[in-house]
Amino acid sequence: MVSNQDYTERIRDLMKDHNSWMESSINLIASENITSSRVKEALISDLSHRYAEGLPGERLYEGCRYIDEIEEITIELSKKLFRAEHANVQPTSGVVANLACFFATADVGDPMMAMEVPYGGHISHAKVSAAGVRGFKIYTHPFDFENMNIDADAMKKKILEVKPRIILFGGSLFLFPHPVEEAVEAAEEVGARIMYDGAHVLGLIAGGYFQDPLREGADMLVGSTHKTFPGPQGGIILCREELADDIDEAVFPGLVSNHHLHHVAGLGIATAEMLEFGSEYAAQTIRNAKKLAENLNELGFNVLCEHLDFTESHQVVMDVSDIGRAAEISKKLEANNIILNKNLLPWDDVNRSDDPSGIRIGTQEITRRGMKESEMSEVAEYIKKVVIDGRNVKEEVSEFMSSYTKVHYAFEESGAYKYMEIL
């Protein structure tokens, strides 16, 4: 008979197995990353047990003497990194951050313009998720299929036509900067707020690359803190000072009771790391993405946007419909310790999420493990061996990845997937 303690040991063993698998894998999931040992230390601290409702200095609980200072430091570091007038670090996810901005700046029934999901928009921008929860009427940005981006001229005309309360940029399939500056004049004419969901590219923006939404005219920059930004899972809102009170009230008491204090501490540490190393990390992530795209293209894969040098972000996107089903290809690669995901492409029906045409790749985690352009040809070759040649390369991949076990772009190089055993 299995005892309750046996289950605790089983779960512990599974966590260790997971860490070992990740260490021996090429992880190309575009929405994930690895944190430094200092961030991990924060995540297992006593802060994970505590409550601190409200803002620093205005808590509803006692016992927040040190918690207040941690959050204040994290807020100030975030404002410095993003050159923002105001920062709220309490959202427990990127979707919660989005929803807080929706509640703070618009009402039920208001129109919002956003990317359609197959075009690259995140599900929280759609009626079935956070935007629908707020009761928005959703209008989609006109899309340029060839250039995989919003059609700026058509967008400006549509803004004047539908008069949205929020113009939302950003998405989860995100190769090139969005036309924020081009929207400003039309937004001012119709009284719209410009919101930028930087969840995927937040680390690139922090490093001074991709684009600078707050300088280009966005009122709000929001995102999750664990994709290209190598922090703990959570969300952040950066905005103009005039929106600060409404944003803070939308977060608490509006959407979040107690936020995750250990994640706030981890975010503060990760933000300090990005202030120190973010520029180098972001630049290398983009260089790796461009090189990997070039290598895959040379090997015969249909990598999108060759005419635009493939990408300006951490992402590489392939249409694999001419060689197989993306769902099957991603499973074959997973069996060979190459982890990525199938993805809808703009020409796919939104209901085909289980059987789309595309593969999405991200280079941020392998960059954090120390890879540079020279390794991208090997990564591309392993993908080809599995997908085109039908070979098993699991052992080769594991051996290859044994040289990349440390976290880079941090104050000390530590084991990327070391299991932090306490007992």
Curated annotation (Swiss-Prot):
PROSITE patterns: SHMT. Gene3D superfamilies: Aspartate Aminotransferase, domain 1, Type I PLP-dependent aspartate aminotransferase-like (Major domain). One of its GO terms (molecular function) is pyridoxal phosphate binding. GO terms for biological process: glycine biosynthetic process from serine; tetrahydrofolate interconversion. It comes from the Archaea. It catalyses: 5,10-methylenetetrahydromethanopterin + glycine + H2O = 5,6,7,8-tetrahydromethanopterin + L-serine. Its EC number is 2.1.2.-. (6S)-5,6,7,8-tetrahydrofolate binds at G121, H122, I123, E242. Its cofactor is pyridoxal 5'-phosphate. The modification N6-(pyridoxal phosphate)lysine is found at K227. It is found in: Cytoplasm. Pathway: Amino-acid biosynthesis; glycine biosynthesis; glycine from L-serine: step 1/1. GO terms for cellular component: cytoplasm. The record marks H226 as: Plays an important role in substrate specificity. InterPro entries: PyrdxlP-dep_Trfase, PyrdxlP-dep_Trfase_major, PyrdxlP-dep_Trfase_small, Ser_HO-MeTrfase, Ser_HO-MeTrfase-like, Ser_HO-MeTrfase_PLP_BS, SHMT-like_dom. It holds the Pfam family SHMT. Catalyzes the reversible interconversion of serine and glycine with tetrahydromethanopterin (H4MPT) serving as the one-carbon carrier. Also exhibits a pteridine-independent aldolase activity toward beta-hydroxyamino acids, producing glycine and aldehydes, via a retro-aldol mechanism. NCBIfam families: PRK00011.1 (NF000586). Homodimer. Belongs to the SHMT family. This is Serine hydroxymethyltransferase.
